Amino acid sequence: MKIYSLLVVKDEADVVGLSVADACRWSDKVIVIDNGSTDGTWELLQAMADDNPRIVPFMRYEGPFHIGLRSKAFAAFRREMHLGDWWCVRLDADEFYPGDVPALLRSIPWYCRTVKKISTDYVITHEDLAENILSGDFAADRPRLHYCLPDKRRERRFMRHSPFLVWLARWRYPHPWGFVARQSIPVDHYQYRSVEQMQRRYANRQQAKAEGCGSFSHESGASWQEYLRHRSDCTAVNTMHDNGLPPSVEI
């Protein structure tokens, strides 16, 4: 069983080295499309690829972001896949998988074609900034992020390979999806990591929306500061995993 993971990045040098190294634990290939990074993300991934053949810097795309960018990598590598293999159809640079991904996928019933993630969505709080606990170095700050959104989000992440899968550029995922597995795979999601990163995220997404990307409709705030939360509205979590986390959660 192979797992090919499809990653689109833009200006995520603060986290992508850690998340891609983590994804290489369970991915046979991490196939990367860079959407015009200017912060050294692409160069970092190329340097990592020199030492790790699982990392494939596939292409650099300077045009406007659109939801079907990953379809380009899917089309280029689908001939390497066979029945029994899996696609991570959306690997995000700010997501970490603490469980045993291959073991979970092997446990999925044969008739299920899609597996969702269930994410712990970490946030930066107003109190974090007031207490000045963050250094701006995500590797150092990750254990200091102790609050997450109260609701667990589920989104498609893995699809079983089939020669009948079709992925058009206007689609977010390949079709047909088929049956969705009851098991979901846990993900630690760090979409907010520092003030500088939140400012950059806000600017990039506003630009993408203005260019008609067809995504980020939830990004409706007036400034990056609307990413911040109050601790009273969040759930406190233990951020240190010991890899004893169960690999799946029942829906």
Where are these regions (language model features)?
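Active-site beta-to-alpha loop of glycosyltransferases that engages the nucleotide-sugar donor
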Residues: 2-21, 36
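A structural signal for isolated positions on well-ordered beta-strands in alpha/beta enzyme cores
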Residues: 4-6, 29-31, 56
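Short, acidic, metal-binding catalytic loop of nucleotide-sugar glycosyltransferases
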Residues: 20-32
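Short, structured coil segments at secondary-structure junctions
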Residues: 26, 48-51
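A conserved acidic beta->alpha catalytic loop
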Residues: 34-45, 62-65, 92-93
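Short, conserved alpha-helix that lines the donor NDP-sugar binding/gating region
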Residues: 42, 46, 66-81
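Conserved donor nucleotide-binding strand/loop of the catalytic core
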Residues: 51-68, 72
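Catalytic-site signature of metal-activated, phosphate-bearing donor transferases
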Residues: 67-75, 86-89, 97-251
